[in-house]
Amino acid sequence: MVKARKEPVNAVQVFGRKKTATAVAYCKRGKGLLRVNGRPLDQIEPKVLQYKLQEPLLLLGKEKFAGVDIRIRVSGGGHVAQIYAIRQAISKALVSFYQKYVDEASRKELKDILTQYDRTLLVADPRRCEPKKFGGPGARARYQKSYR
């Protein structure tokens, strides 16, 4: 019995982050599948931010995504933070896939298009919530002071 040799899976795994939301994207050769937690992109809520999710696809064109499957797991954060994490994960996954398995010139082209439009598509936003301190209701606000 001869075992059929499986060709190695050309895949990359990257993550996108926004606040406490983390999206892990797994990108491999395929036929253009894009799924978030097992659901297609157009079923992701809220519908108002649907265009934010579509931005990498609209910027780079569907033909760039035709040869790859991207599966994304997202957790943590709120709805908006998750959407920003997903779009970052999609962009980073495609760029790193092109770097590893296609060629450096097309990777640079993709990276330039994405950063020219919006830098947060590839670079995480470092802003975090400031911790609350004593003497006030929040991080900076103080309780009202009375003299008499």
From Swiss-Prot:
What is the name attached to this protein's record?
Answer: Small ribosomal subunit protein uS9
Q: Which GO terms describe its cellular component?
A: cytosolic small ribosomal subunit
- State the family named in the UniProt similarity comment for this chain: Belongs to the universal ribosomal protein uS9 family.
Gene Ontology molecular function, alphabetical: RNA binding; structural constituent of ribosome
From which source organism is this entry? Answer: Aedes aegypti
Q: Which Gene3D superfamilies match?
A: 3.30.230.10
**Which PROSITE patterns is this protein grouped with?**
RIBOSOMAL_S9
Please indicate which superkingdom the organism of origin belongs to. Eukaryota
Gene Ontology BP terms: maturation of SSU-rRNA from tricistronic rRNA transcript (SSU-rRNA, 5.8S rRNA, LSU-rRNA); translation
Q: Which keywords does the record carry?
A: Ribonucleoprotein, Ribosomal protein
Keyword Ribonucleoprotein among UniProt keywords: yes
Q: Name one Pfam family in it.
A: Ribosomal_S9
